[in-house]
Amino acid sequence: MFTLKKSLLLLFFLGTINLSLCEEERNAEEERRDDPEERDVEVEKRFFPAILRVAAKVGPAVLCAITKKC
């Protein structure tokens, strides 16, 4: 009877630790996913280089058309 209680206690303890670790990991993933500041940074990283490339290609043509010095 004592060995049965001991093994059940061990299983309960290990299960509790496992659930605790899973909950912490899930909370960390939710924080990463729901963080609006991080999402804004990702959007900035994605769109600013594209905007700069388009401006670099179109900019000289626009300046040439405005100043008429080509």
Swiss-Prot record:
Disulfide bridge map: 64-70
Subcellular location: Secreted
A Pfam family matched in the record: FSAP_sig_propep
Leader peptide range in chain numbering: 1-22
Tissue specificity comment: Expressed by the skin glands.
GO BP annotations listed: defense response to Gram-negative bacterium; defense response to Gram-positive bacterium
Residue span(s) of the pro-peptide: 23-44
Name of this chain's protein: Brevinin-1S
